[in-house]
């Protein structure tokens, strides 16, 4: 496998959205919400999760890098840098199912960490859900330390009385 990591191009968005939906299906907050409440506002969890990539591309397109194997995108990482706080953030990382378990996620994270370090940042953040065992194994193996656990809640507003006018 000959992997090249290159900067994101606008034309990459559909493919990285596809990778996102495939990779995050079993470990996505939006999927958990849909499993509990059903489809919301006519938009399924996959639409919501793919939309996160649109937001990443709008916020900091230079922070997205894709991994190619023989010209095909097989993974990506999104990052954004808070230079004032000295922290680099990794909101999304996905690898094509046929390329998992071969070190590509590790390679993409290492690439991002090198970018953060070269930019003068002092720390990097990444987060994962409790149900994402791959992330929980990978991130500590790369030196990340768990600092907190978070619980996510959702409320169906149809169950709430209308405000008085």
Predicted feature residues:
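Acetyl-CoA-dependent GNAT
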Residues: 7-11, 18-91, 96, 109-111, ...
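Conserved GNAT acetyl-CoA-binding A-motif
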Residues: 116-127
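Charged catalytic carboxylate motif
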Residues: 15, 107, 134
């Amino acid at each position: 496998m000959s992997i090249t990591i290159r900067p994101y191009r606008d034309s990459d968005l559909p493919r990285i959205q596809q990778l996102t939906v495939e990779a995050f299906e079993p470990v996505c907050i939006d999927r958990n919400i849909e499993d509990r409440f059903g489809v919301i506002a006519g938009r399924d969890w996959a639409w919501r999760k793919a939309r996160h990539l649109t937001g990443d591309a709008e916020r900091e397109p230079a922070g997205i890098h894709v991994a190619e194997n023989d010209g095909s995108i097989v993974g990506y990482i999104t990052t954004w840098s808070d230079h004032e706080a000295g922290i680099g953030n990794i909101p999304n990382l996905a690898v094509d199912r046929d390329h998992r378990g071969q070190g590509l996620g590790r390679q993409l994270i290492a690439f991002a960490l090198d970018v953060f370090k070269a930019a003068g940042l002092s720390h990097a953040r990444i987060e994962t859900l409790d149900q994402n065992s791959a992330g929980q194994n990978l991130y500590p193996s790369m030196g990340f330390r768990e600092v907190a656990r978070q619980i996510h809640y959702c409320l169906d507003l149809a169950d709430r009385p209308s405000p008085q006018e």
